[in-house]
Amino acid sequence: MDSDQSFNATLRMFDTHVNLLEILHGKPAMATVSLFSGGFFTGRPQTHDHSSLLGMRPKKQGHSSRPLKLHLRHTPDGYNLIIKNTGEHDNKPIGKRWLDVLGAQDPGPDKSMLFTLVDRQNNPITLKNMSTPQVPVSLMTENKKYIGGLKVRGSPYIYLAETEEKSKVTFILSVL
């Protein structure tokens, strides 16, 4: 870990709130989801609490929301993203939780997920080469996929998930 390249920041978007679903929509953030596999229904719809999953909500919907606060822990292969919101999920790393959806995870060596901050031309960004305290970034996973919005049948939420490049979102990373 390179502590000189680690830093705290907020992650937001211009017209969309980004945070845990419990902050965006209230707790519990329940979703009743029907799963399909290869065009076939694979069971009864099940209701789950998605409060600890990451999502986005248009700013014009509902009340305002604070931005997602993170600690970006630098490693030679990318950044671990650690949630720094006060509350139940403070100090929990972000990782894949359900389908390809990201959320707060209990800490553990086998669960950490690495992300690369990239600019619009897909060039890696680190604290060292940021020229301003607010930088537009996309997040690339260690699988060379991007973080973008995902809508799941039966759920009222838009999740942050591992997606293809065409579905990636651009965030505003504000160094604190």
Locations of regions flagged by a protein language model:
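Lectin-like carbohydrate-binding module/patch detector with strong preference for beta-trefoil
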Residues: M1-L176
